């Protein structure tokens, strides 16, 4: 993403922008994905042209307003997730799905690399029936093409409550100076 575009992205920790994650506004849509540790996943989506805001948080569990420490105990059922606000005139939901499939291993259950636990599971949380259909179709397409050696274990489920993670997790790689080119193939 070019510098100007990145500067215009909303920051999940600024007070005036936190509402965008629940009510994106006219012409914008939201998507929610879980694919391992949310720090790298968020950074990958932040690099996509058309993504106007990202936030990391917890979704898919049964515990209200969990903390990072609670999610890590495996007792809450939440996955580390990323809420993505995007402009569908610039980037389609299908394009976001393509990013999702490429930035993690959707064939490992409750694990991504060295991170092990239910909070690291692969999940597409759909916000409407169109997203559900697109997610199911993209998964089926990958399975038919034999892209992965092992079966895809990604859950495709309706979005549940998204609880914003603590401020120190938001844009973690940027704050720590670990900006990565996770998506070199997705750059213009």
From Swiss-Prot:
Catalytic reaction equation(s): L-methionyl-[protein] + [thioredoxin]-disulfide + H2O = L-methionyl-(S)-S-oxide-[protein] + [thioredoxin]-dithiol; [thioredoxin]-disulfide + L-methionine + H2O = L-methionine (S)-S-oxide + [thioredoxin]-dithiol
Domain of life according to the entry: Archaea
Keyword annotations: Oxidoreductase
Keyword Oxidoreductase on entry: yes
Residue numbers annotated as active site: 37
Top-level class of the enzyme under EC nomenclature: oxidoreductase
Family to which this protein belongs: Belongs to the MsrA Met sulfoxide reductase family.
Database matches in PANTHER family: PEPTIDE METHIONINE SULFOXIDE REDUCTASE, PEPTIDE METHIONINE SULFOXIDE REDUCTASE MSRA 2
Described function: Has an important function as a repair enzyme for proteins that have been inactivated by oxidation. Catalyzes the reversible oxidation-reduction of methionine sulfoxide in proteins to methionine.
Stated name of the protein: Peptide methionine sulfoxide reductase MsrA
Phylogenetic lineage: Archaea, Methanobacteriati, Methanobacteriota, Stenosarchaea group, Methanomicrobia
């Amino acid at each position: 993403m070019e510098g100007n575009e990145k500067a215009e992205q909303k920051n999940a920790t600024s007070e005036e922008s936190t509402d965008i994650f629940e009510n994106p506004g006219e012409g914008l849509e939201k998507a929610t994905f879980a694919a391992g540790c949310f720090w790298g996943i968020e950074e990958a989506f932040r690099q996509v042209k058309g993504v106007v805001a990202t936030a990391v948080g917890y979704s898919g569990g049964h515990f209200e307003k969990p903390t990072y420490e609670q999610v890590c105990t495996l007792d809450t059922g939440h996955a580390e997730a990323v809420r993505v606000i995007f402009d569908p005139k610039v980037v389609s939901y299908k394009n976001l799905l393509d990013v999702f499939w490429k930035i993690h291993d959707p064939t490992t259950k409750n694990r991504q690399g060295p991170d092990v636990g239910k909070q690291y599971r692969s999940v597409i949380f759909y916000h409407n029936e169109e997203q559900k259909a697109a997610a199911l179709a993209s998964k089926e397409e990958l399975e038919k093409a034999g892209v992965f050696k092992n079966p895809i274990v990604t859950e495709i489920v309706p979005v549940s409550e998204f609880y914003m993670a603590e401020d120190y997790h938001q844009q973690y790689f940027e704050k720590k100076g670990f900006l990565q080119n996770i998506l070199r193939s997705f750059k213009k």
